[in-house]
Amino acid sequence: MSGDLSSRLERLLPNGRGVWIPMDHGLSGYPEKGLENMDSVIDSVINARADAIVCHKGIISHQYERTGFTKFVCHVSASTAHGGQNSQYKVKIASASEALSRGAVGVSGQVNLGDPNEPEMLRDLGILTSEAHEVGMPVLGMVYPRGPNLVTLPNDITGGVAHAARVAYEMGCHVVKVPWTGNAESFRKVCEAVPIPVLIAGGPSGGTFDETLEIVRYAMAAGGAGVCMGRQVFGAKDPFTCVYALREIVHDA
């Protein structure tokens, strides 16, 4: 592992754990509750000591210049709600070197397993990990088993989530974001499937934040490395308090 890569990984995942806040949702669909004033919400999560913020390149350019925050991860996959049958087809919209030049220290790519366009998304993630390798940037793989062609093996208690983590690992990602599997036993299988840090996604907002925190406790006990949660944080009345509470579980428990 290169010196640049290892130092950037340690910055984003101190002691191998992280509270990452993705705010890439506004490209897919807008209005998005909590993302109307990006300056305000980004200031809140920075002040609460989030370990990373995941955004698209345009937001990073503006916010890096404004804040000097050195832990942006550039999400390079995009689609919108207007794409019809291709609305879940994430296309690559930036390179690792461009992300670096805009102020990011890591990059993120998404694959939706089982989508009719899965092969193209796998190709794009492979290109991204190769680019990132050249410039010493860590890669977050957001891999979700959610498409209509998804095949789940009868003995897979994770519902394809372990395979999603394995896809990210084998394609060269350094961190993977996956959905919660519903219980600690199955999530432990996900974490055991790969030697890279596994971050739990938040999913659609719903329920209480206390319920979200309880899931995070289960995930950490099962071997998780932290969270990559967006709507539960930026859509809340007080994002600062949400990040602080997540840090207490991920870093201090």
Where are these regions (language model features)?
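Alpha/beta enzyme core
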Residues: 15-67, 71-198, 206-229, 236, ...
